[in-house]
UniProtKB/Swiss-Prot annotation:
Keyword Ribosomal protein found: yes
Assembly and interaction partners: Part of the 30S ribosomal subunit.
Protein name listed in UniProt: Small ribosomal subunit protein uS10
InterPro entries: Ribosomal_uS10, Ribosomal_uS10_CS, Ribosomal_uS10_dom, Ribosomal_uS10_dom_sf
PROSITE patterns, per database record: RIBOSOMAL_S10 (PS00361)
Biological function: Involved in the binding of tRNA to the ribosomes.
GO molecular function, one term: structural constituent of ribosome
Pfam family, one: Ribosomal_S10
BP-aspect Gene Ontology terms: translation
Entry similarity comment: Belongs to the universal ribosomal protein uS10 family.
Keywords associated with the record: Ribonucleoprotein, Ribosomal protein
Gene Ontology CC: ribonucleoprotein complex; ribosome
Length: 102
């Protein structure tokens, strides 16, 4: 018989908020009797933007901005119905994007 697995992928710009949300999910899953694999940190996506500092001339004067997107993956193996209910009721931070695959 094939084991059922829930894969949860979290994305966020602030790694501290992401780690807190990950910890909440892990604690909730373990409390309801499911086995958790992870969290596995995935590579951080670094996006850089270069803009001119002044509006007129001076092409040599530029400024760089960057956005870092941190990612984590959790696998919940053989979840119980209580685990699924608890995860649906879980309220996570606003800066975290959650993607769930069954």
């Amino acid at each position: 018989m094939q084991r059922q697995k829930i894969r949860i992928r979290l994305k966020g710009f602030d790694h501290r908020v992401l780690d807190v949300s990950t910890r909440e999910i892990v604690n909730t899953a373990k409390r309801t009797g499911a086995q958790v694999l992870g969290p596995i940190p995935l590579p951080t996506r670094l996006e850089k933007f270069t803009v001119l500092r002044g509006p007129h001339i001076d092409k040599k004067s530029r400024e760089q901005f960057e956005i870092r997107t941190h990612k984590r993956v959790l696998d919940i193996v053989d979840p119980t119905p209580q685990t699924v209910d608890a995860l649906m009721k879980l309220d996570l931070a606003a800066g975290v994007d959650v993607e769930i695959k069954l």
